[in-house]
Each structure stands twice: as structure tokens, then as C-alpha cells.
Amino acid sequence: MATVDLRDNLLGISWVDSGWVPILNPSNVLEYFSERSNPFYDRTCNNEVVKMQRSTLDHLTQLVGVEYILLHTQEPILYIIRKQQRQSPTQVIPLADYYIIAGVVYQAPDLGSVISSRALSAVHGIQSAFDEAMSFCRYHPSKGYWWHFKDQEEKERVKPKSKRKEEPSSLFQRQRVDTLLLDLRNKFPPTFYQTKPGEKPVPVEVKKEPEVPVETVKPQEERETKPPAPPAPPRPPPQTTPNKPPPEKRARVQ
């Protein structure tokens, strides 16, 4: 298995020496940064040359090469150190920035790394959205494409089915059913069998009752809404004619 060099991925690591944290200040922060266990420090820099010559940091301007300087401080916890390439006493090229917060050293990301990380996060989110959308897509040759969401099935399962309330029957319906049952009984009367010991059962004829004309039962609403008929006018008394005797018969003269 190949090992990964930490120097190739310095943006994802940090370094701290807890022995220096209580005494850290602007005068010794560069010495703290130049510890041998610090992976961010380059030992071929001009700072090591000045340290070997036991000179001050002011002599860095007279050398050409990589150097580290204290760029900004905000005591007691924030220190910013810059790595730069010096080409002349007045011309330098920034290479990287490092910030120390409460004794922990981090490398500040460059603009290209920030843009790459943001673009990768956006593409990952878009790809996840497409994958999620495709999981709900369905296709059939006869139906085509449609969406099938799982939430709809769960809602249909959880949603209680409302039972329809049965309405009570009305008086008209009950009377109508009774009339139909009575009519069927008259059309198809039941046949009773009288059994005797040792003989076959003999059917007993049932006298069929004469059918009574069934008056149509009007709905109760019509009877309630129909106004009562006015009373009939009284009939005049019958005229009495006096009894007249029949006319006398006269003899016919020939």
C-alpha cells in the first residue's frame, strides 16, 4: 500500500506543541514555528542560515531565497506567518500563509483551492439531487415516464379510510319494501307438505287470496307539501213533487 506524503496535503493537517502555548508571544513565535516537528517549516530557508550565523532577522533582506516573516499579530491567540521568495531587498513573491490560533498551526488555503472546493461541493450536491430524482422516475412503453414518490404510498397507508355512514330509511322506503314483499308472497305462495306415517308426503294446497289493489303510496314529502282539498259544497235537498192521479181514459169514438 502506497504511503501518502503529508507535505502533498498540508491543507488538511495541523500542528501544535503544547509546551510552547503558555509562553507564546510575538518575539518567539517564529522560533516556535521553526520547530523540527513542524511539517510546514522548510529547513532550507534563509531563516536557518541567519540562525546558524547568530544574526538578527534584519539580515534576511540581504539574502535571496525562501524566508518566513511575521506578517500580522493579534495577541494573545492569533499570529499570521508568511512564506515568501525574496528576489531582491525590495522585491518578494508570496508563496503561502500560515495562521496560528491558540498555539495550533494551520495552512491558509489559496484562492485556487477555495474555488476548487466550492465547485466540488456544488457538483456533488447537484449530482446527489439528480440521483435522488432518478430514483423516483418510472418508465413503461405504454404509459411513458411518470414520477412515483414513496411519500404518497406512506400517506395512503397511514391515512384512515373513512367509513360511509348509513342513513336511516324513510317511512316511504319501509312501506314500499313491505308492499313488495307482500306482493311476492301472493305471487309465489309457500307449499306445505303433510306427512303421514308410512306414506309419501302429500302437498297441501294453500288457497290463494284475491289480490287487493295496492294503492300507490306517495312519498311523505309530497303528502306534507300538498295543500288539503277544499270541502265539497253541500248538495241541495231533493225536490219533492206532489203525487198526481193518472189521467182518465176516454172512450174512443169510431
From Swiss-Prot:
Subunit structure: Component of the Mediator complex.
Gene Ontology CC terms: core mediator complex; mediator complex
Coiled coil location: none
InterPro entries per record: Mediator_Med6 (IPR007018), Mediator_Med6_met/pln (IPR016820), Mediator_Med6_sf (IPR038566)
Localization annotation: Nucleus
Organism of this sequence: Danio rerio
Annotated TM spans: none
Keyword set includes Transcription: yes
Function in brief: Component of the Mediator complex, a coactivator involved in the regulated transcription of nearly all RNA polymerase II-dependent genes. Mediator functions as a bridge to convey information from gene-specific regulatory proteins to the basal RNA polymerase II transcription machinery. Mediator is recruited to promoters by direct interactions with regulatory proteins and serves as a scaffold for the assembly of a functional preinitiation complex with RNA polymerase II and the general transcription factors.
Listed Pro residues bias regions: 227-245
Chain intervals for the UniProt region annotation (Disordered): 190-254
Domain of life: Eukaryota
GO molecular function: transcription coactivator activity
Lineage, opening ranks: Eukaryota, Metazoa, Chordata, Craniata, Vertebrata
Name of this chain's protein: Mediator of RNA polymerase II transcription subunit 6
Alphabetical UniProt keywords: Activator, Nucleus, Transcription, Transcription regulation
GO biological process: regulation of transcription by RNA polymerase II
Family the entry assigns: Belongs to the Mediator complex subunit 6 family.
